C-alpha cells in the first residue's frame, strides 16, 4: 500500500507485482537473498520456486564467486570519464563463444537492447517494417504492434496489452507471427516489405519442421536482417545462445538476464557488416 502511494503500480517491473501472484499475501520486498532463499522485511525466509529474479539468477542469488569479483571491481572505482576495459574483454569473449559474430554493444536492460538492435537492423536493411515473434520489451516500436488490434500481442506479451501514449503513426510498422508458423511469416514478408525479423529462438515449445532453418533462409534470400532475442534463453541450455544448440545463426543476437546473474547488463552481438550501421545512427547512453 505504501509503495502504491509513491510508485505507479507499486513496482518498477510488471512481473514483480505481488497482485499477479497472491494479492495481500505475497511478500513484495526483500531484505536479503542467498542461493535460492529470500528474506522479506519481517525476516521471514522463503525458498524461491518462482522466477529467481525474473530469470536472471541462473547460478543462484549472491553467488560467492561472482559477488567477490563484483565487489573487487566496485572498490577499484565507479564510472569515470574514461571507458572500462572490461567492455573489450567481455565483447571478445562473446565473439569467441559465437564465431559467426564480430562486434558487440552493451546496454543495461533487455528493452533497451531490443530497441538498439531494431535501430541497427532497420538501418542495415534500409526498411522500416519488422516481423516479430516473442516478447521484446516495452518500447514504442514493439507495442505499436497492438495499434489497430489490441489482441496482436496476446500470445507474445499479455492479453490486450495497454499502449496509450504510443504514437499512432507507428501503426503497420510491426507485424506479429506465431512460432512454428512459417507460412504466416512468409506472407508478411511478401505483403509488407519486411526488413527485419526479430524473434525468440525458443520459449514454451520446440521448433518443428526445420522452422528456424526456414526463417534463416527466408531472411537471407530477401535481404532481411534476422535478430534472435536471447534475453530469456541465453546461457541456460548452452554456454551462450540457444541458437548454438539448433545450429542456426542470426545476424544479430541479444543477451541479458542470465548474462549478469542478477546484475544489470545486456549485450547485442552481430556480424560486422550489420553492426557497423551503429555508426550511421545516434546510439549512446551514459550508463
What residues fall within each predicted segment?
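Conserved N-terminal phosphate-binding loop of PLP-dependent enzymes in the Aspartate aminotransferase
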Residues: 1-287
Amino acid at each position: 500500500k505504501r509503495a502504491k502511494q509513491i510508485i505507479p503500480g507499486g513496482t518498477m517491473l510488471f512481473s514483480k507485482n505481488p497482485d499477479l501472484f497472491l494479492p495481500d499475501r505475497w511478500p513484495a520486498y526483500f531484505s536479503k537473498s542467498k542461493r535460492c532463499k529470500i528474506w522479506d522485511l519481517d525476516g521471514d525466509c522463503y525458498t524461491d520456486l518462482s522466477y529467481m529474479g525474473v530469470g536472471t539468477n541462473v547460478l543462484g542469488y549472491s553467488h560467492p564467486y561472482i559477488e567477490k569479483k563484483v565487489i573487487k571491481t566496485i572498490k577499484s572505482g565507479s564510472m569515470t570519464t574514461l571507458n572500462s576495459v572490461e567492455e573489450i574483454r567481455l565483447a571478445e569473449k562473446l565473439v569467441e563463444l559465437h564465431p559467426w559474430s564480430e562486434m558487440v554493444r552493451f546496454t543495461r536492460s533487455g528493452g533497451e537492447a531490443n530497441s538498439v538492435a531494431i535501430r541497427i537492423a532497420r538501418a542495415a536493411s534500409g526498411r522500416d517494417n519488422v516481423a516479430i515473434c516473442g516478447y521484446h520489451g516495452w518500447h514504442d516500436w514493439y507495442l505499436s504492434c497492438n495499434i489497430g488490434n489490441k489482441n496482436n500481442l496476446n500470445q507474445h506479451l499479455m492479453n490486450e496489452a495497454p499502449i496509450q501514449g504510443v504514437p499512432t503513426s507507428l501503426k503497420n510498422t510491426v507485424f506479429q507471427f506465431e512460432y512454428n508458423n512459417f507460412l504466416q511469416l512468409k506472407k508478411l514478408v511478401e505483403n509488407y516489405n519486411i526488413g527485419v525479423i526479430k524473434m525468440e529462438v525458443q520459449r514454451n515449445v520446440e521448433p518443428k519442421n526445420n522452422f528456424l532453418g526456414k526463417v534463416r533462409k527466408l531472411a537471407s534470400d530477401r535481404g532481411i536482417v534476422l535478430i534472435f532475442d536471447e534475453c530469456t534463453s541465453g546461457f541456460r541450455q548452452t554456454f551462450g545462445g540457444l541458437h548454438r544448440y539448433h545450429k542456426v545463426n542470426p545476424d544479430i543476437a541479444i543477451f541479458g538476464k542470465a548474462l549478469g546473474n542478477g546484475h544489470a547488463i545486456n549485450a547485442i552481438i552481430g556480424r560486422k557488416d550489420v553492426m557497423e550501421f551503429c555508426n550511421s545512427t545516434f546510439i549512446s547512453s551514459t550508463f
